[in-house]
């Protein structure tokens, strides 16, 4: 099975991607055009719609005929968590808001980009998938770990987070 996608994090307002935060109808039309064009040449291809998971993500949904699965971006950045939430968040706390917004489409959900950056204790807690009851996220089918240094600056002077799995925390990455 092959999956294609286009225009990830289209609902993001942070200005990191030139295609994000378009007028929703413009994005939907462009996404549908992409899928229609691909289907002509690769009819067996499936399509992943990959929002950031913001409150208005539904406005960017291109419709059930254009989405086979949903891919969410989920990142845990300790300095951001402490500033925005007053403390460290675990895997479930990071995923829940965007998952809850995406589950209403009743499509399989993947975390198409996942990473944690912070001290060893934070990264261990963030990566502990075994601490989550699978019943809490029944549509979640897989996770792709984004093990790289962020290519672009994060807002609010957070710099370029380092999402790489390191020897001191790789034993805490649990299935």
Regions found by a protein language model. Give the residues of each.
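Short catalytic/ligand-binding loop motif for oxyanion handling, primarily in non-cytosolic enzymes
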Residues: 3-9, 56-58, 79-80, 118-119, ...
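Substrate-binding cleft/loops of secretory-pathway carbohydrate-active enzymes
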Residues: 51-73, 121-132
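Glycoside hydrolase catalytic-domain groove-lining segments
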Residues: 60-119
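Active-site groove signature of glycoside hydrolases
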Residues: 1-24, 45-51, 56-57, 70
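Substrate-binding cleft of secreted/luminal carbohydrate-active enzymes
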Residues: 107-175
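Aromatic-lined carbohydrate-recognition surfaces of secreted/lumenal glycan-active proteins
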Residues: 1-2, 31-58, 107-119, 145
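Long, well-ordered alpha-helical scaffolding segments within enzyme catalytic domains
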Residues: 24-39, 90-106, 122-136
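Short loop/turn segments at strand-loop or loop-helix junctions that form parts
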Residues: 1-10, 73-75, 114, 146-148
């Amino acid at each position: 099975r092959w999956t294609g996608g286009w225009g990830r994090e289209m609902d993001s307002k942070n200005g990191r991607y030139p295609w994000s935060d378009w007028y929703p109808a413009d994005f939907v039309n462009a996404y549908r055009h992409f899928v229609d064009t691909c289907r002509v040449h690769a009819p067996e291809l499936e399509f992943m719609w990959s929002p950031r998971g913001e409150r208005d993500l539904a406005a960017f949904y291109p419709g059930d005929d254009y989405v086979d699965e949903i891919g969410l971006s989920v990142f845990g950045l300790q300095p951001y968590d402490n500033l925005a939430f007053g403390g460290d968040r675990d895997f479930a706390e990071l995923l829940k808001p965007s998952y809850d917004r995406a589950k209403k489409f009743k499509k399989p959900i993947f975390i198409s980009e996942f990473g944690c950056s912070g001290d060893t204790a934070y990264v261990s807690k963030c990566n502990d998938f075994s601490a989550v009851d699978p019943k809490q996220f029944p549509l979640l089918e897989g996770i792709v770990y984004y093990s790289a240094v962020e290519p672009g600056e994060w807002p609010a002077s957070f710099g370029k987070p380092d999402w790489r799995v390191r020897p001191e925390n790789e034993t805490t990455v649990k299935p």
